[in-house]
Amino acid sequence: MGMRPTARMPKLTRRSRVLILIALGVIALLLAGPRLIDAYVDWLWFGELGYRSVFTTVLVTRFLVFLVAGVLVGGIVFAGLALAYRTRPVFVPNNDNDPVARYRTVVLARLRLFGIGIPAAIGLLAGIVAQSYWVRIQLFLHGGDFGITDPQFGKDLGFYAFELPFYRLLLSYLFVAIFLAFVANVVSHYLFGGIRLTGRSGALSRSARIQLVSLVGVLVLLKAVAYWLDRYELLSHTRGGKPFTGAGYTDINAVLPAKLILMAIAVICAAAVFSAIVLRDLRIPAIGLVLLLLSSLIVGAAWPMIVEQISVKPNAAQKESEYISRSITATRQAYGLTSNVVTYRNYTGDGEATAQQVAADRATTSNIRLLDPTIVSPAFTQFQQGKNFYYFPDQLSIDRYFDRNNNLRDYVVAARELNPDRLIDNQRDWINRHTVYTHGNGFIASPANTVRGIANDPNQNGGYPEFLVNVVGANGTVVSDGPAPLDQPRIYYGPVISNTPADYAIVGKTGADREYDYETSADTKNYTYTGSGGVSVGSWISRTVFAAKFAERNFLFSNVIGSNSKILFNRDPAQRVEAVAPWLTTDSAVYPAIVNKRMVWILDGYTTLDNYPYSQLTSLSSATADSNEVAFNRLLPDKQVSYIRNSVKATVDAYDGTVTLYQQDEQDPVLKAWMQVFPGTVKPKGDISPELAAHLRYPEDLFKVQRMLLAKYHVNDPVTFFSTSDFWDVPLDPNPTASSYQPPYYIVAKNIAKNDNSASYQLISAMNRFKRDYLAAYISASSDPATYGKITVLTIPGQVNGPKLANNAITTDPAVSQDLGVIGRDNQNRIRWGNLLTLPVGQGGLLYVEPVYASPGASDAASSYPRLIRVAMMYNDKIGYGPTVRDALNGLFGPGAGDAATGIQPTEGGAPANVPPNNAPSPEALPGTPPSPPTAVPPAPEASVTLSPAKAAAMKEIQSAIGAARDAQKKGDFAAYGAALQRLDDAITKFNNTQ
């Protein structure tokens, strides 16, 4: 049967072609239109911020990389196709059984489409992928030296950081391009008769043989280059079963020689492949390729495995000793843990302390932090929210200021931001949402070492934070009662206000003031934004662009937008910093501060590498995970790093959105490279004002990475390192509701870096022994300007209780558990344990402090905010417990120990400070010490006063409760005493409410 005639492609009419072109144009517009709009909006946004050079540099770099990579890969593939076509056989036998004849006809009919379209498509894809590597290329072009050489090849580390990644990228693209050219060449020769799979002779034309052999030879040469580069990558290699990163004994003595041998074999094989051009014998290159494959299996895989199993494993500690030492040195360099940064000191951890010694530690005892920033947010909401649309984050921040007596104190701080998601009813209307409710109002700070009033029951008036507020007052002036003066408390930029899909506000003078600002007793006062931030939307072009950007027609039709209108968008501080510095990794925490009478958001930025020779490779998400990060879902991306520097401090003005980047690490070669890529975007460290320096803090995420590494890399001896016997562990959070590691804590305490009693703002963490619950070390990182970044490690030799054991001892103490059982009222009230702080006090001792909160009911509603109810402490197996820090210290160390402790502030109702309410235990009411009976009760009526029967009965109940409390005191029965206090509280309430 004859073969069916080859079908021809149908011809399109003119109308069909026009319709297809229109359809393609519409598709292209739909695909490219949003991207063009986004690019134009970004151009406007970067220009408004003063960072347009960043936008243009990144855009031009991406375009050039796209162009070069696309032309390179597409050109090589095109060359493979073109050579195959131009050297095709003049006569191609065409019998009826030829399976490719039909395809050959189709290709010949659309030769330009296939000959240009296929390379263009491949080049397009290659360019799209390559442009994402613009960071690697810019570092190659601008990277410099580290001034440190690797211990194996003697090359400066700048080669590994900046050059080697580029060489590997270039090699990968060349390999892919040549391979695709080889495939294209094979297909073309097969299609046009250069390769025939039928018949006994002429299976491969001369031109096909030359071209294919040449391409295979180039691939083998590229493989030889890859073997050469593999040698350097061994120094940042991780292999299973090896307790360190980098080349070990097997890598240096087996894998490294194997790479050189394989490189030589690859060069020989390439020569054998090229020989087929002249010798016309394909068996020689085939033998060469088989030899290369076998060599890679025997020399590259089998031989190192034999060395590892026979020579290394039986004597691993000794064999790997030299290379472990290399890893210890490199890891300390890469993570900023060298001897000029980290100081180790011996510390007993269980030294005895007298009341006088504890009182002398005034910087510590007067600053014991009672407010847990993860717990007190509902109290901020209850007392300071004001309106339904204002909001405080669930986790607040810690910063320090000098109080009115010029004492350094730590504060729980928060900005009262506007939360668009909390708008209700007509507030959600587009005009109200984007032109009326535009900003927050106020900076709130609470001294972390005190509360207002003593509460023995969560329903009492006490135990809540003392609030220092900077806010726009009822008369329109700024009330500046906060820890520092603030000229402009309005907040247009922040992490809360931006946490919504439609993150923009339209501001500017278009008639009467429109923006909600504050309320008086008579009416609502509005405001008009006067800051420099924002992109103009006064022209119809801008209105059209933003209407398309946000898919909102009101930009075109609303009369609230005028010639002076501006749009504020991209208002998240971290995202703004990441946009203007795309080479930075930002810390998960951003905190507000008052600097030079302006409210700013402060962020930490990191420069990182993932190929620092011999340095431990670390996952940022794993290293920075703790109970707070897990609870509030703030985990960093799963990025692998082997080098990190807190190279940049960034500020974002809360009013006008100005982003300022400051150089923090003046020695970081990675930062220096980026400062050359984007000149003028990062200000020198000398531009950091003293006012800003006073609020910079050691970054939390960096500290968590460093403490995880210090758990291993504090060890100097490589044999001990290999045995892991002296490793440490990051302790788990002892709080029963936590599910991860204990977070580090910012505190003000005595200066560990200077080893004196001056007050110091520091970030601290306890460290456990490996797989044990006993303390191994105490780490403190200084945030003071004079000693910023200095890390002090107190090593603890004995068996000192770690956080878990301390928490267990406190919570299971009979007196504590009985008292909290009374307060909890059989789970009718919720008891919450605050952060467990570890504080060095006295001469070599460690004090554990854990505040206790209680809230009415079992819910987390703002109306049932937690109140500080007790303070629990532990020192050398002894428990201190009471309503105040002073009480707990006196009970733990004896009278006078708490003399320096900060007192309780008066309640809003005016109750005097440091005076327990009617049913509060006196300072002696501590475990092991019977409390004094309560005496503050309603005054007895004068003889001439006749009480109603109900009041007389209530008075008898009060007297009976007092008697029961005194009896419990004599017996030392703490549970009975607590029950008597509760009876007394109920009786007093009944007396006051009875007519």
UniProtKB/Swiss-Prot annotation:
Residues 900-948 are annotated as: Disordered. The chain crosses the membrane at residues 18-38, 63-83, 113-133, 175-195, 210-230, 259-279, 287-307. Residues 928-941 have a biased composition (Pro residues). It is found in: Cell membrane. Keywords: Cell membrane, Membrane, Transmembrane, Transmembrane helix. InterPro entries: UPF0182. GO terms for cellular component: extracellular region; plasma membrane. Its main location: membrane. It is a multi-pass membrane protein. The keyword Coiled coil does not apply. It comes from the Bacteria. Belongs to the UPF0182 family. HAMAP family: UPF0182 (MF_01600). NCBIfam families: PRK00068.1, PRK12438.1. This is UPF0182 protein MMAR_1371. It comes from Mycobacterium marinum (strain ATCC BAA-535 / M). The lineage of its organism: Bacteria, Bacillati, Actinomycetota, Actinomycetes, Mycobacteriales.
